[in-house]
């Protein structure tokens, strides 16, 4: 249901700035995410920096192209582990 989908997305925002307890090894990450994560966690993010904007745009395009909701959620969970929390 829509309510269940909303709840699963809302859970991604809990403890957003906390360091993840478990890291997904780079080999196990989805290949579509291999080109994001240049701006490491804890660094200042700003869309006024061209490199930051390009990375955020690329991440958006990856998430937007997800095959279905479950694929989208998987990509979000994996990206949350290593992508800058401001992004």
UniProtKB/Swiss-Prot annotation:
GO CC annotation, single: extracellular region
Major place of residence: secreted
Secretion signal, residue range per the UniProt entry: none
SS bond list: none
Domain of life of the organism encoding this protein: Eukaryota
GO terms for MF: oxygen carrier activity
Localization: Secreted, Extracellular space
Tissues expressing the protein: Hemolymph.
Pfam family, one: Hemocyanin_N
Keyword Translocase: no
Matches recorded under InterPro entries: Hemocyanin_N (IPR005204), Hemocyanin_N_sf (IPR036697)
UniProt keyword terms in alphabetical order: Copper, Oxygen transport, Secreted, Transport
Entry's family note: Belongs to the tyrosinase family. Hemocyanin subfamily.
Function: Hemocyanins are copper-containing oxygen carriers occurring freely dissolved in the hemolymph of many mollusks and arthropods.
Assembly description: Polymer that contains six different types of chains (alpha, beta, gamma, delta, epsilon, and zeta).
UniProt protein name: Hemocyanin alpha chain
Organism: Tachypleus tridentatus
